[in-house]
C-alpha cells in the first residue's frame, strides 16, 4: 500500500503519517517503521525546528527510526529500507523538491539560480521508479501549495507548478491519497 498525504502547512499531514507508522508498529512485533526525513538544517531556525520534530516524534511514535537524508538519497533509501515488514514514511516531498530546485550552493549565490529542469526531472523519475518497485508499505507527505494565490515571481510559479506535477505523478502510483484539512483526513483516492 502506497499512500500520499497532502495538506497545507500545519494541516496535520505529518501527524497522520506518524499515526500510520504507530499503528503499523503496534500491529505486529516484527514490524519496523522508518521515517526518511528530507529537511536539511541550513540555518538556526531550521536546526531548532528539526530538533523539536525529533523530540516530539520520539514521544509520539516510540520505535520509529529516523534517517536524515540529502536530496539525492530519497529514491535509493526508499528502496533500501522497503520490505514487507517495514513501513517507510517520506517526510516530505516538498522539501526534497525544494533542495533539488535550489541546491545549497545556489541558495547562497547572489544571482537567482535557474535549476536544471532535466536534472530535477531525472530525480523525480527515479523517485517514481522506486515507488513502483517498493517491497512494502510507503507513506509520502507533501504540501498542497497550489490552492493559494498565484505567486509573483517566475521561479516560484515554476516551483509551484513542478510540485503540483510531482504530487499528481505520485498520486497516480499510490493506492490511497489523503488530503489533510485542519487535522481531519479527507480520503481523495482509495479506501478509508
Regions inferred by a protein language model and the residue ranges of each:
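Residue-level signal for inorganic ion chemistry
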Residues: 17, 53, 89, 143, ...
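Short, conserved beta-strand edge motifs with alternating hydrophobic and charged residues
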Residues: 36, 66-69, 89-92, 140-141
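A basic- and aromatic-enriched beta-loop-alpha substructure that forms the phosphate/nucleotide-
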Residues: 71, 80-101
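Loop/turn-to-beta-strand initiation segments
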Residues: 63, 84-87, 134-139
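Flexible, compositionally biased loop and terminal segments
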Residues: 2-6, 94, 190
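Conserved P-loop
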Residues: 2-82
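Residues at the starts of beta-strands that form the adenosine-phosphate
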Residues: 31-34, 86, 137, 176
Amino acid at each position: 500500500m502506497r499512500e500520499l498525504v497532502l495538506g497545507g502547512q500545519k494541516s496535520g499531514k505529518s501527524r497522520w503519517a506518524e499515526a500510520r507508522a504507530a499503528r503499523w508498529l503496534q500491529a505486529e512485533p516484527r514490524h519496523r517503521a522508518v521515517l526518511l526525513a528530507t529537511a536539511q538544517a541550513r540555518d538556526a531556525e531550521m536546526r531548532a525546528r528539526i530538533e523539536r520534530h525529533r523530540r516530539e516524534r520520539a514521544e509520539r511514535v516510540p520505535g520509529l527510526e529516523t534517517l536524515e537524508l540529502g536530496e539525492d538519497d530519497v529514491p535509493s533509501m526508499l528502496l533500501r529500507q522497503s520490505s514487507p515488514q517495514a513501513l517507510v514514511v517520506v517526510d516530505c516531498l516538498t522539501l526534497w523538491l525544494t533542495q533539488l530546485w535550489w541546491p545549497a550552493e545556489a541558495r547562497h549565490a547572489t544571482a537567482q539560480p535557474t535549476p536544471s529542469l532535466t536534472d530535477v526531472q531525472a530525480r523525480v523519475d527515479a523517485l517514481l521508479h522506486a515507488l513502483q518497485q517498493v517491497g512494502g508499505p510507503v507513506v509520502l507527505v507533501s504540501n498542497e501549495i497550489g490552492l493559494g494565490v498565484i505567486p509573483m515571481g517566475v521561479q516560484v510559479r515554476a516551483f509551484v507548478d513542478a510540485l503540483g506535477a510531482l504530487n499528481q505523478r505520485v498520486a497516480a502510483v499510490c493506492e490511497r491519497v489523503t488530503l489533510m484539512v485542519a487535522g481531519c483526513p479527507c480520503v481523495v483516492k482509495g479506501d478509508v
